[in-house]
């Protein structure tokens, strides 16, 4: 079924006040199923005679594959909640949807979408994406722009009416393996919130545990004006540091738990524009996954705490890395110090006392701190175990003076 060059107009006093036009294509129609549905068109309601407000919009193309139209109509007509839910779980038979070039303007409301796609298979939304979405409410002074948004792996195949099923699937992230939103700008009354990149990827679960993931949150912008409403002095300090109308921070975290051999790697970074950034990487071993599962499932508090204690006793360190990178924070703080050389001398004395059994490491740390205070750039600490060292044994190793026989410690500053 093809209908092209469709057009419907309403004229008042020889003036066109409403127009609706476009095309519709249907193929593979059988037993209430439509194999393919394709549509494009535009509409204009100049004075709001039909839609209640001045409206104009256009759609370059929408394509739907595999729509089970019969069951959808039956569920709605019969008000059958179970049938409607069952059809929702299967996506009404739809396997793919694509939208291109959507524009809608209703009075002071404006929306646009360059493209959108959905792919569904076996009750799972395998891919959902939006590109170049925008919404504006000029009356409320609100504007939202999203460069790209996407997610993968959303599971629709469970009972939405069952609280237990909803909770169980929530612990499994509803099957999601990737979520991302990029180049976001939200402006209200002249104040802009922004996100360069907010994403969760590489998601893997085992028995309800998140054993692998990568979280990135980059370029999170918060307007200084909003902070000023809570604390003006803090807002002024931030503005002096950043010389910007926004407080911008970035955060990332990745973890990888090998449930077979008990190794656990974690990487964490946090940065604030105009201030500083830190990075922490750590590798652990001896993390008993089966014991962790039993602790997670235990409803006995004492049993749970005992299990956690045993896990802590067996947990070992392979390596730890810390890095501090300065932007302006150290410069500003040191500008308030009357005598930096005296600060270095006092620091040297404290280090000599604390690391009296480790003179080589003490000298390296003193040199690194001195270099950092002079360069105010980066300061790094690394600890690498020659063989896995139980974390609970580290304090005793340090006191004994034998720690460097098991763990290589290094400092660097510039």
Question: Language-model segments: which ranges?
Answer:
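Glycine-rich, small/hydroxylated-residue low-complexity segments
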Residues: 1-414
């Amino acid at each position: 079924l093809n209908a092209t060059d469709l057009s419907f107009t309403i004229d008042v006093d020889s003036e066109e006040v409403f127009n609706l036009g476009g095309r519709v294509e249907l193929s593979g129609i059988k037993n209430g199923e439509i194999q393919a549905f394709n549509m494009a068109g535009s509409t204009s309601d100049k004075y709001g005679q039909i839609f209640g407000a001045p409206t104009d919009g256009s759609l370059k193309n929408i394509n739907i594959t595999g729509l089970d139209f019969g069951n959808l109509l039956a569920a709605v007509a019969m008000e059958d909640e179970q049938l409607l839910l069952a059809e929702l779980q299967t996506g009404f038979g739809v396997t793919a949807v694509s939208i291109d070039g959507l524009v809608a303007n209703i009075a002071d409301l404006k929306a646009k979408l360059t493209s959108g796609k959905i792919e569904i298979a076996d009750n799972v939304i395998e891919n959902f994406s939006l590109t170049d979405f925008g919404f504006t409410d000029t009356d409320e002074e609100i504007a939202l722009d999203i460069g790209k948004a996407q997610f993968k792996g959303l599971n629709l195949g469970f009972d939405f009416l069952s609280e237990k099923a909803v909770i169980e699937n929530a612990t499994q992230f509803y099957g999601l393996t990737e979520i991302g939103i990029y180049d976001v700008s939200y402006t209200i009354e002249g104040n802009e919130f922004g996100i360069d990149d907010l994403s969760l990827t590489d998601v893997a679960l085992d028995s309800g545990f998140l054993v692998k993931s990568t979280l990135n949150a980059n370029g999170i912008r918060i307007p200084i004006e909003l902070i000023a409403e809570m604390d003006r002095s803090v807002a002024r300090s931030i503005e002096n540091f950043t010389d910007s109308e926004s407080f911008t921070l970035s955060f990332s975290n990745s973890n990888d738990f090998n449930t077979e051999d008990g190794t656990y790697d974690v990487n964490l970074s946090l940065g604030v524009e105009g201030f500083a950034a830190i990075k922490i990487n750590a590798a652990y071993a001896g993390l008993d996954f089966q014991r962790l599962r039993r602790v997670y499932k235990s409803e006995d508090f004492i049993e749970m705490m005992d299990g956690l204690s045993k896990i802590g006793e067996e947990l070992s360190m392979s390596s730890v890395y810390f890095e501090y990178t300065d932007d302006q924070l150290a410069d500003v703080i040191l500008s308030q110090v009357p005598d930096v050389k005296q600060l270095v001398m006092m620091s040297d004395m404290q280090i000599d006392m604390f690391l009296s059994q480790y003179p080589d490491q003490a000298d390296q740390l003193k040199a690194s701190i001195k270099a950092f205070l002079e360069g105010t750039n980066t300061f790094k600490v690394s600890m690498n175990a020659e063989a896995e060292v139980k974390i609970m044994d580290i304090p005793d190793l340090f006191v004994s003076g034998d720690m460097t026989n098991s763990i290589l410690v290094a400092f660097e500053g510039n």
